[in-house]
Curated annotation (Swiss-Prot):
GO terms for molecular function: calcium channel regulator activity; voltage-gated calcium channel activity. It comes from the Eukaryota. Disulfide bonds: none annotated. PANTHER family: VOLTAGE-DEPENDENT CALCIUM CHANNEL BETA SUBUNIT. The modification Phosphoserine is found at S152, S393. It comes from Oryctolagus cuniculus. GO terms for biological process: calcium ion transmembrane transport via high voltage-gated calcium channel; positive regulation of high voltage-gated calcium channel activity. It is found in: Cytoplasm. This is Voltage-dependent L-type calcium channel subunit beta-3. Residues 1-52, 129-170, 385-477 are annotated as: Disordered. Residues 59-128 form the SH3 domain.
Length: 477
C-alpha cells in the first residue's frame, strides 16, 4: 500500500545526506590547510622576532630623515604584530639592516626608542598609491567639476607644486649622527664671533673627551644642496661660478662628514662659510644648528669696538649678519645659547648633547659603544680614517680642532707667558683660530692644566685656569 506512495522531499533529503557525507573530507582539508597556513605564519613571525632581537646588537648601517608620517600599529602586514614603528615627518631613524624588500629593521632616534620594523621606501610608495586609488574611487564627480569653476593658481605655480609633491621621497639619507654647527653671534672670520665659538669648541672638546670629533671644514657646504649634487648641469654652472670651493671638494667633505658620523660619536663642524641656518637647509647633512646669541645689539657693538680699529672697520657688516640671525624664527635653530655667562651657555649646550647622545645610542648593552670607532664590531672596514690604534691617522689629525697647546703655540706664546702677560694684554692674546694651518697636533693631546673634567683634587685649580684663559667676552649681556 505504501510502496508506491510518494513522500515529497524524501529523495532530496537522502541526496542531501549523501552530499554531506561526501563534502566532509573537503571541509577537513580546508581546516587542515588553514592550520598549516597559521602554523607557517607563526613560524615566520617567530623568525622575524628573533631577527629583531639580534638587530639590537648590530651597528647602525645608515640613518634617514622622514618626509612622511607613518603608524605601524595600523599596518596589519608588519612581520611581527605590534612591532611596527611610529614616526612623524622630520623624525630621524637609525637603520640596522634590511629584513625584506618591504621592511627594514631599525629604531626611532629618541631616548628609549626600541628596535622595530620600518617600512621601506617601496612599501611606503605602495601604500601611497593605494590611498590615491581609494581617494579616486570615492571621489565626487560634482566636486571635481566645482574645482574647474574655482579660481585656480597660475599654471606655472600649480605645475611647480605638483612637481614638488611628486618627487618628494619618503626618506632622505642623512649622517648617522647629526653634525653640530655653530652660528652667530655674527660673521665667522671676525674676532668676536671666532673667540666666542672657540670657547665653546674648547669646552666641548674637554667635556665630551672620547665621544666627540671636532673637525674644521673650509669648503662652502652651502653648495651641497641635493638638487645640485644630483644634477650634472647645475654642477657645471656652479663649478664655473664658484671660486672658493669646487663641487668635487664639497662632495668630498660631505662624504667625510658621513664617515665620521658612522662611529656614532658626536660630530662638531667648525664650518668657516656657514653663518646662517638657511645655508644648510637643503643639504643632506641635517645639522644641529646652535645659535650663539648676544641678546642686545648694543652689547655686540661694544664687543666689536673693544677689539680695536681693525674690527671697527667691519662693524656694519657684522651688525647686518647679526640682524639676519635675530630675525630668524626660533624653530630655525635646535639650540639657542642666550645665557649671560660662558658657564651657563656651556652647560646648556652640554645638556642638549647629552640627551642627543642617549637618543642615538640604544639602551641595550652593545660592545664598544662608548669606545673609539675601531672597537665597534663591523665598523672597522667602514672607517674613512683607516685603522686606528692609540694615535689618530694623518687625515684625522688634520681634521680635528687644534688643542689648546697648538692654538697657544700658533700665537707664539706659551701658557706661562699668557699667565704673566694676562693682566695688561688681554686684547693682544686673541689670534683668530681660522688662520691655523692643518698640520697641527691631535686634539686629544690635552695638557692636564687645561682640562675641564679633571680629578676632584684638581678641579678648582683647573676651573680657575679655564676662567682666566677663556676668550669669552667679559661683558654681562
Amino acid at each position: 500500500m505504501y510502496e508506491d506512495s510518494y513522500v515529497p522531499g524524501f529523495e532530496d533529503s537522502e541526496a542531501g545526506s549523501a552530499d554531506s557525507y561526501t563534502s566532509r573530507p573537503s571541509l577537513d582539508s580546508d581546516v587542515s590547510l588553514e592550520e598549516d597556513r597559521e602554523s607557517a605564519r607563526r613560524e615566520v613571525e617567530s623568525q622575524a622576532q628573533q631577527q629583531l632581537e639580534r638587530a639590537k646588537h648590530k651597528p647602525v648601517a645608515f640613518a634617514v630623515r622622514t618626509n612622511v608620517s607613518y603608524c605601524g600599529v595600523l599596518d596589519e602586514e608588519c612581520p611581527v604584530q605590534g612591532s611596527g614603528i611610529n614616526f612623524e615627518a622630520k623624525d630621524f631613524l637609525h637603520i640596522k639592516e634590511k629584513y625584506s624588500n618591504d621592511w627594514w629593521i631599525g629604531r626611532l632616534v629618541k631616548e628609549g626608542g626600541d628596535i622595530a620594523f620600518i617600512p621601506s621606501p617601496q612599501r611606503l610608495e605602495s601604500i601611497r598609491l593605494k590611498q590615491e586609488q581609494k581617494a579616486r574611487r570615492s571621489g565626487n564627480p560634482s566636486s571635481l567639476s566645482d574645482i574647474g569653476n574655482r579660481r585656480s593658481p597660475p599654471p606655472s605655480l600649480a605645475k611647480q607644486k605638483q612637481k614638488q609633491a611628486e618627487h618628494v621621497p619618503p626618506y632622505d639619507v642623512v649622517p648617522s649622527m647629526r653634525p653640530v654647527v655653530l652660528v652667530g653671534p655674527s660673521l665667522k672670520g671676525y674676532e668676536v664671533t671666532d673667540m666666542m665659538q672657540k670657547a665653546l669648541f674648547d669646552f666641548l672638546k674637554h667635556r665630551f673627551d672620547g665621544r666627540i670629533s671636532i673637525t674644521r671644514v673650509t669648503a662652502d657646504l652651502s653648495l651641497a644642496k641635493r638638487s645640485v649634487l644630483n644634477n650634472p648641469g647645475k654642477r657645471t654652472i656652479i663649478e664655473r661660478s664658484s671660486a672658493r670651493s669646487s663641487i668635487a671638494e664639497v662632495q668630498s667633505e660631505i662624504e667625510r662628514i658621513f664617515e665620521l658620523a658612522k662611529s656614532l660619536q658626536l660630530v662638531v663642524l667648525d664650518a668657516d662659510t656657514i653663518n646662517h641656518p638657511a645655508q644648510l637647509a637643503k643639504t643632506s647633512l641635517a645639522p644641529i644648528i646652535v645659535f650663539v646669541k648676544v641678546s642686545s645689539p648694543k652689547v655686540l657693538q661694544r664687543l666689536i669696538r673693544s677689539r680695536g680699529k681693525s674690527q671697527m672697520k667691519h662693524l656694519t657688516v657684522q651688525m647686518m649678519a647679526y640682524d639676519k640671525l635675530v630675525q630668524c624664527p626660533p624653530e630655525s635653530f635646535d639650540v639657542i645659547l642666550d645665557e649671560n655667562q660662558l658657564e651657563d651657555a656651556c652647560e646648556h649646550l652640554a645638556e642638549y648633547l647629552e640627551v642627543y647622545w642617549r637618543a642615538t645610542h640604544h639602551p641595550a648593552p652593545g660592545p664598544g659603544l662608548l669606545g673609539p670607532p675601531s672597537a665597534i664590531p663591523g665598523l672597522q672596514s667602514q672607517q674613512l680614517l683607516g685603522e686606528r690604534g692609540e694615535e689618530h691617522s694623518p687625515l684625522e689629525r688634520d681634521s680635528l680642532m687644534p688643542s689648546d697647546e697648538a692654538w697657544t703655540g700658533s700665537s707664539q706664546r706659551s701658557s706661562r707667558h699668557l699667565e704673566e702677560d694676562y693682566a695688561d694684554a688681554y686684547q693682544d692674546l686673541y689670534q683668530p683660530h681660522r688662520q691655523h694651518t692643518s698640520g697641527l697636533p691631535s686634539a686629544n693631546g690635552h695638557d692636564p692644566q687645561d682640562r675641564l673634567l679633571a680629578q676632584d683634587s684638581e678641579h678648582n685649580h683647573n676651573d680657575r685656569n679655564w676662567q682666566r684663559n677663556r676668550p669669552w667676552p667679559k661683558d654681562s649681556y
